[in-house]
Amino acid sequence: SLRVVDGDTIVLNGEKIRFSGIDTPELKQTCMNGDEKVFCGKSAKMLLIKKIGNETPECISEGRDAYKRTLAECFVNGESLSAFLVRSGYAFAYRKYSDKFIKDEEFAKENKLGMWSMKFQYPWDFRKI
């Protein structure tokens, strides 16, 4: 069984998995697209749901985080979901923990994809409010 919690967390067969090395906006977090308020956290979740489709992600565990969630990189048809989300502009490379997805982030930024075409707050700043 699979449930997508948000843009960077899934529950796979009862195990809560947090994608390592990336950070997506919180579900209640908004971005500004011109004058329009966009729920970019929900957009990230929807993009992930669409990307997974009817597939079952294969996850490579990298240990646990402070919240006892499994940290992992998950793949669908051989493609990293983390890299996909960052490259689409709906997740950020979590530089504090990993430099793995910086190139994907630079690609999204250069091409103004996803949140890079909007005004946004980094999720780690948003959570401090």
Where are these regions (language model features)?
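Small beta-barrel nucleic-acid-binding modules, primarily SNase/OB-fold domains
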Residues: 1-129
